[in-house]
A protein has these predicted regions:
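Conserved N-terminal helix/loop that builds the PLP phosphate-binding region
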Residues: 1-20
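PLP-dependent aminotransferase class I/II
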Residues: 11, 36-44, 48-54, 127-131, ...
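Conserved N-terminal alpha-helix of the aminotransferase class I/II PLP-enzyme fold
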Residues: 14-62, 84, 304
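Phosphate-binding glycine-rich loop
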Residues: 36-78, 89-96, 102-104, 169
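PLP-dependent aminotransferase-like
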Residues: 69-165
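Conserved active-site segment immediately N-terminal to the catalytic lysine
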Residues: 156-190
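Short beta-strand-to-turn element immediately C-terminal to the catalytic PLP-Schiff-base lysine
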Residues: 180-181, 195-200
């Protein structure tokens, strides 16, 4: 009977369903402004990453906006960007009058190709955003060496790389500063939030001043995020997914809806004005959630890492880029390259495993934006990288179904 309900969703919220309901109820009356509680979370988070300071904003894109703004880079300065990321980061870079410049990826670690990065940096390059995709650790020491030699400002985006390490040092602790997004389905999910980290006291002081100028938070925005989180949690609940969500996805597919992206397709049009919502304060309620989530993230990661390793062991002929340096990664997503992703996903779904591809944008391919260009490796990662379910709250039955399915695909 249990095995009947063991079909596996593509992902899951880290909060339990009970916690999601409790958070929704608590958020209705919880105090939103409490600087002491926010600072407590910031201190704990900074210590956890191995940084001296943390400053919290409503979104990662907001933190990146201010990190670039306080550097006072001249308009027209180039910012090296990952070809795969969220569109909001591109929007804030352009809003500051800066020019995006893309560098292609390394196929095995989803981060910048070292030689291509070195070749791309010139006298007009002022900053770089190093993004770690899917919980995979690149040779960050080499990338930092290249950037420091060329004297450019290094910002790490480790939103998908929490707890991944290089030389026993956590990603997010290498650059001049770093950013973590605590949005839905992240390892630490506080119903939104973008956290800025640095050891540079002067830089942090400037960021703190920007934080103080943010608009007051609005409870309705927080409630919407928590409700959306709860709905996703319900949809991926083991029983509800098997009875309702999985049949719904099949029906949508029949009627021509693209259901192969992780969280669906997103608007690709440039925004004319940055929304005020991006500049509202992070709340004390979110900080309280963060303090609680910090205590369990490592144990959750251990479960996911063990699952990822077993999947790769069970499928020796499937091309997993993350096999290289596998003990350094945390596998926020486990990525298999497929020659025909549509068929690969269809076969997995026929075996009860809901696989998908990334919902992140191929920024370098957005024709409506300046700087668009061909990035062959990034295009392969974006179009042919299939996510094998790899989340921490999988049941034993769900894990076994993934192992069995991947063995059949591999044979």
């Amino acid at each position: 009977m249990i095995y009947m309900f063991s079909k596996v969703p593509r992902g899951s919220i880290n909060h339990s369903l009970v916690d999601s309901v409790a958070y929704l109820l608590q958020s209705i009356t919880s105090k939103l402004k409490n600087d002491k509680k926010i600072f407590e979370f910031e201190e704990l988070f900074a210590q956890y990453i191995g940084r001296k300071y943390c400053v919290s904003f409503p979104f990662a894109r907001t933190a990146i906006y201010f990190a670039l703004k306080v550097k006072n880079l001249p308009k027209g300065t180039e910012v090296i960007m990952p070809p795969i990321s969220i569109k909001g980061i591109l929007d804030v870079v352009l809003s500051l009058g800066l020019i995006p410049k893309y560098v292609d990826l390394d196929l095995n670690n989803f981060c910048f190709d070292e030689q291509k990065l070195s070749n791309a940096i010139d006298e007009n390059t002022g900053a770089i955003i190093i993004t770690y995709l899917f919980g995979t650790a690149p040779n960050i020491e080499k990338l930092i060496e290249i950037c420091k030699r060329k004297k450019i400002f290094v910002l790490e985006d480790f939103s998908q790389g929490l707890n991944a390490t290089v030389s026993k040092k956590k990603l997010g602790s290498f650059g001049d500063c770093s950013i973590y997004s605590s949005s839905a389905i992240k390892q630490i999910d506080t119903f939104g939030g973008g956290h800025f980290f640095s050891d540079d006291k002067e830089l942090v002081s400037r960021m703190r001043k920007e934080q103080e100028q943010l608009y007051p938070s609005k409870r309705i925005f927080l409630l919407k995020k928590i409700l959306r989180n709860l709905m996703y949690n319900l949809a991926t609940n083991q029983i509800i997914f098997n009875i309702f969500t999985d049949p719904l996805l099949k029906a949508l597919k029949i009627f021509g809806t693209d259901v192969n992206r992780m969280t669906g397709n997103r608007d690709q049009q440039p925004i004319k004005v940055i929304p005020n919502e991006w500049f509202r304060s992070y709340t004390a309620f979110q900080a309280c959630v963060g303090i609680r989530e910090l205590k369990k993230v490592q144990s959750f990661d251990h479960k996911r890492i063990a699952h990822a390793h077993k999947v790769m062991e069970n499928a020796p002929s499937i091309d997993f880029g993350q096999r290289t340096n596998k003990d350094q990664h945390t596998y926020w997503q486990l990525v298999a390259y497929a020659k025909n992703p549509e068929t690969f996903i269809k076969n997995l779904r026929s075996l009860g495993v809901d696989a998908c591809t990334s919902s992140l944008e191929l920024l370098s391919g957005l024709k409506e934006y300046p700087g668009s260009t061909n990035m062959p490796v990034a295009e392969k990662v974006h179009s042919k990288g299939v996510f094998i379910p790899c989340f921490s709250r999988m049941s034993k039955w769900q894990k076994n179904r993934v192992y069995e399915a991947i063995e059949i695909i591999d044979s």
